[in-house]
Protein backbone atom coordinates (compact mmCIF):
# COMPACT_ATOMS: atom_id res chain seq x y z
CA UNK A 1 0.00 0.00 0.00
CA UNK A 2 1.37 3.38 -1.00
CA UNK A 3 1.58 5.86 1.85
CA UNK A 4 0.01 9.26 1.20
CA UNK A 5 2.47 11.73 2.68
CA UNK A 6 0.16 14.68 2.07
CA UNK A 7 -2.58 13.78 4.52
CA UNK A 8 -1.96 15.31 7.92
CA UNK A 9 1.50 16.52 6.99
CA UNK A 10 1.99 20.25 6.64
CA UNK A 11 -1.71 20.88 6.09
CA UNK A 12 -3.45 23.16 8.47
CA UNK A 13 -6.42 25.43 7.97
CA UNK A 14 -8.63 27.34 10.34
CA UNK A 15 -11.92 25.48 10.53
CA UNK A 16 -15.10 26.86 12.06
CA UNK A 17 -17.74 24.61 13.58
CA UNK A 18 -21.23 25.93 14.30
CA UNK A 19 -23.75 23.71 16.11
CA UNK A 20 -27.30 24.97 16.58
CA UNK A 21 -29.35 24.42 19.72
CA UNK A 22 -31.64 21.88 18.02
CA UNK A 23 -28.63 19.61 17.51
CA UNK A 24 -27.50 19.39 21.12
CA UNK A 25 -29.17 17.48 23.92
CA UNK A 26 -29.60 20.50 26.18
CA UNK A 27 -30.19 23.24 23.60
CA UNK A 28 -26.68 24.65 23.91
CA UNK A 29 -25.21 26.36 20.87
CA UNK A 30 -21.56 25.80 20.04
CA UNK A 31 -19.31 28.06 18.03
CA UNK A 32 -15.68 26.97 17.76
CA UNK A 33 -12.68 27.44 15.52
CA UNK A 34 -9.34 25.73 15.16
CA UNK A 35 -6.24 27.80 14.52
CA UNK A 36 -3.63 27.18 11.86
CA UNK A 37 -1.00 29.62 13.12
CA UNK A 38 2.34 28.42 14.45
CA UNK A 39 1.71 26.42 17.63
CA UNK A 40 5.09 27.56 18.99
CA UNK A 41 3.83 31.13 19.29
CA UNK A 42 2.15 31.40 22.63
CA UNK A 43 -1.11 33.20 23.25
CA UNK A 44 -1.60 36.15 25.53
CA UNK A 45 -4.84 36.30 27.47
CA UNK A 46 -5.64 39.98 27.71
CA UNK A 47 -8.40 41.56 29.78
CA UNK A 48 -9.58 45.08 28.99
CA UNK A 49 -11.88 46.95 31.38
CA UNK A 50 -14.99 48.91 30.47
CA UNK A 51 -14.05 52.53 29.84
CA UNK A 52 -15.67 55.83 29.01
CA UNK A 53 -12.36 57.09 27.63
CA UNK A 54 -11.09 54.49 25.16
CA UNK A 55 -8.96 55.09 22.08
CA UNK A 56 -10.69 57.24 19.47
CA UNK A 57 -8.90 55.67 16.51
CA UNK A 58 -7.76 52.20 15.54
CA UNK A 59 -4.49 52.12 13.61
CA UNK A 60 -3.38 48.76 12.23
CA UNK A 61 0.18 47.68 12.96
CA UNK A 62 0.73 45.92 9.63
CA UNK A 63 -1.31 47.88 7.09
CA UNK A 64 -2.57 51.39 6.48
CA UNK A 65 -6.08 50.58 7.75
CA UNK A 66 -7.45 53.03 10.29
CA UNK A 67 -10.91 53.83 11.55
CA UNK A 68 -12.53 55.98 14.23
CA UNK A 69 -13.74 54.30 17.42
CA UNK A 70 -16.36 55.29 19.97
CA UNK A 71 -14.79 56.57 23.21
CA UNK A 72 -17.07 54.34 25.31
CA UNK A 73 -15.81 50.77 25.18
CA UNK A 74 -17.06 47.61 26.84
CA UNK A 75 -14.58 45.46 28.69
CA UNK A 76 -13.48 42.35 26.80
CA UNK A 77 -11.00 39.52 26.68
CA UNK A 78 -8.70 38.75 23.77
CA UNK A 79 -6.32 35.97 22.76
CA UNK A 80 -3.70 37.50 20.47
CA UNK A 81 -0.43 35.80 19.66
CA UNK A 82 2.29 37.25 21.88
CA UNK A 83 3.91 39.24 19.07
CA UNK A 84 0.64 40.93 18.00
CA UNK A 85 -0.49 42.57 21.22
CA UNK A 86 -3.04 44.96 19.67
CA UNK A 87 -4.22 42.86 16.72
CA UNK A 88 -5.31 39.30 16.02
CA UNK A 89 -7.43 39.14 19.19
CA UNK A 90 -8.97 35.97 17.71
CA UNK A 91 -11.49 34.98 20.42
CA UNK A 92 -13.14 36.13 23.62
CA UNK A 93 -16.17 37.74 25.24
CA UNK A 94 -17.15 41.25 26.21
CA UNK A 95 -18.88 42.39 29.41
CA UNK A 96 -22.28 42.36 27.66
CA UNK A 97 -21.88 38.60 27.16
CA UNK A 98 -21.15 38.71 23.44
CA UNK A 99 -18.50 36.33 22.12
CA UNK A 100 -16.51 36.75 18.93
CA UNK A 101 -14.34 34.29 17.07
CA UNK A 102 -12.37 35.86 14.28
CA UNK A 103 -9.34 35.46 12.04
CA UNK A 104 -10.61 32.59 9.90
CA UNK A 105 -9.12 33.22 6.46
CA UNK A 106 -11.37 32.47 3.48
CA UNK A 107 -10.16 32.46 -0.11
CA UNK A 108 -12.26 33.64 -3.06
CA UNK A 109 -12.01 32.49 -6.65
CA UNK A 110 -10.52 34.83 -9.25
CA UNK A 111 -13.97 35.00 -10.87
CA UNK A 112 -15.61 36.17 -7.64
CA UNK A 113 -12.88 38.76 -7.12
CA UNK A 114 -13.56 40.22 -10.58
CA UNK A 115 -17.00 41.23 -9.31
CA UNK A 116 -16.14 42.00 -5.68
CA UNK A 117 -12.42 42.80 -5.44
CA UNK A 118 -10.45 43.24 -2.28
CA UNK A 119 -9.56 46.80 -1.23
CA UNK A 120 -5.87 47.31 -0.50
CA UNK A 121 -6.43 49.50 2.55
CA UNK A 122 -9.70 47.87 3.56
CA UNK A 123 -10.63 46.07 6.76
CA UNK A 124 -8.51 42.95 7.27
CA UNK A 125 -9.27 40.02 9.56
CA UNK A 126 -6.60 40.99 12.08
CA UNK A 127 -8.33 44.35 12.64
CA UNK A 128 -11.87 43.07 13.16
CA UNK A 129 -11.60 41.91 16.75
CA UNK A 130 -10.58 45.14 18.47
CA UNK A 131 -12.85 47.27 16.28
CA UNK A 132 -16.05 45.26 16.79
CA UNK A 133 -16.30 43.26 20.04
CA UNK A 134 -15.77 46.16 22.50
CA UNK A 135 -18.62 48.12 20.91
CA UNK A 136 -21.54 45.67 20.60
CA UNK A 137 -24.19 44.45 23.05
CA UNK A 138 -25.60 41.51 21.05
CA UNK A 139 -24.38 39.02 18.48
CA UNK A 140 -26.67 40.66 15.94
CA UNK A 141 -25.07 44.06 16.64
CA UNK A 142 -21.69 42.42 16.08
CA UNK A 143 -22.53 41.15 12.62
CA UNK A 144 -24.26 44.46 11.77
CA UNK A 145 -21.24 46.53 12.88
CA UNK A 146 -18.83 44.27 10.99
CA UNK A 147 -21.01 44.38 7.86
CA UNK A 148 -21.25 48.18 8.03
CA UNK A 149 -17.47 48.43 8.36
CA UNK A 150 -16.95 46.20 5.31
CA UNK A 151 -19.44 48.30 3.34
CA UNK A 152 -17.66 51.52 4.38
CA UNK A 153 -14.00 50.49 4.12
CA UNK A 154 -14.07 47.43 1.89
CA UNK A 155 -12.34 44.18 2.73
CA UNK A 156 -8.61 43.68 2.31
CA UNK A 157 -9.05 39.89 2.26
CA UNK A 158 -11.58 37.14 2.76
CA UNK A 159 -12.41 36.12 6.32
CA UNK A 160 -15.09 34.53 8.45
CA UNK A 161 -16.17 35.96 11.81
CA UNK A 162 -18.64 34.52 14.28
CA UNK A 163 -20.65 36.14 17.07
CA UNK A 164 -22.65 34.49 19.85
CA UNK A 165 -24.75 35.68 22.79
CA UNK A 166 -27.48 34.18 24.98
CA UNK A 167 -30.03 34.33 22.15
CA UNK A 168 -28.35 34.16 18.76
CA UNK A 169 -25.37 32.92 16.80
CA UNK A 170 -24.23 34.79 13.69
CA UNK A 171 -21.51 34.05 11.13
CA UNK A 172 -20.33 36.46 8.45
Task: For the regions a language model picked out, list residue spans one by one.
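Conserved short alpha-helical segments that host acidic/polar catalytic motifs at enzyme active sites
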Residues: 134-141, 145-150
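Second-shell loop/turn segments in exported
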Residues: 115-118, 128-135
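A structural signal for well-ordered alpha-helical segments within the folded catalytic domains
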Residues: 126-127, 140
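A contiguous strand-loop segment
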Residues: 2-124, 145-148, 152-158, 162-172
